[in-house]
Amino acid sequence: MTVNLHDSAYDLEQALRQSEEYSRLKNLYDEVNGDPSAKKMFDNFRDIQLNLQQKQMNGEDITQEEVEQAQKSVALVQQHEKISQLMEAEQRMSMLIADLNKIIMKPLEELYGNPES
């Protein structure tokens, strides 16, 4: 029996969309985006985060001022209940996807060996 991996991937996509983790993430995301003040705060946090990630990927130095700005932004969004809940839901979704990736990569790790072991 031949398995169509793309069909399996689309099934996994649908399962992810129907999961409790995704539902909670989407609801919290919609709530944050429905509140103009929270949306502005969250967008600012994301912009700072993406800017720092881009600099790291480009091998650029991150200034102390940028580090302090990022720390202030994190402290600010963590004080906002809905944004804090959204960030927790994002973390749970990220861990779920990492677990799924481990499962998907298992045949290749078995074939080639796991370099981390």
From Swiss-Prot:
Under the heading Gene3D superfamilies, the entry gives:
YheA/YmcA-like
- What SUPFAM superfamilies is this protein classified in? YheA/YmcA-like
Family statement drawn from the similarity comment of this UniProt entry: Belongs to the UPF0342 family.
Name of this protein: UPF0342 protein BLi01058/BL02870
Q: Which organism is it from?
A: Bacillus licheniformis (strain ATCC 14580 / DSM 13 / JCM 2505 / CCUG 7422 / NBRC 12200 / NCIMB 9375 / NCTC 10341 / NRRL NRS-1264 / Gibson 46)
